[in-house]
Amino acid sequence: MKKLVVAVFALGLLTACSSEPSKPAPVEKPKPPEPITARNAFQKCYIAARNWARDAQPYRIESILTDDSKGREGKSRAWRVGFASPTQQHSSRPYTWEDGEVSFGVEDSYSPSNTSTTVFDQAFLKVDSNQALDTAQKHGGDKLLEKAPDTPILYIVDWNRQTNELTWHVIYGTDPVSAKLRVAVNASTGDFLRVEK
């Protein structure tokens, strides 16, 4: 009996001393969502905006540069869409799609007479950001990217009151002011409009 107790005690000591703490199984990080085009991001933000105001209308769609998304192929990992509501006491609210999630920003005042917040009917947005890029590439973008392949590309779509049309601004650079090239493309037809810089 003593031998059995000693054997069990020795076995217990060996097990306690020699066993390593169990390591947790390596957890794979979920792969971030792929970059998407402006119209895909717009649709996701539009649903959220309609929950805020049933009459929400877009006035601007723009891509946001991130470390791992430089606007290639007309896609981005982050898009911001500005919506305005005439019935919500003339207010506006930005919505952002980033890595698969939609969030909203701070509500702000909205004036229909302000040219930078002129709302547009989404039916005019027939040309997506990747198609706008194709047009811009044919008008100087391809040559610029050959010389400077790391140049980021931004996309902005808004209503142009002077020409009364929805316009894509394909911007080769980190912002519109310091851009190396800006190309305007009709967002309804995909036609080249002009080189803005």
Predicted segments with their positions:
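Long, terminal "pre-/pro-" and other extracytoplasmic accessory regions
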Residues: 17-197
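Sec-dependent bacterial lipoprotein signal peptides
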Residues: 1-15
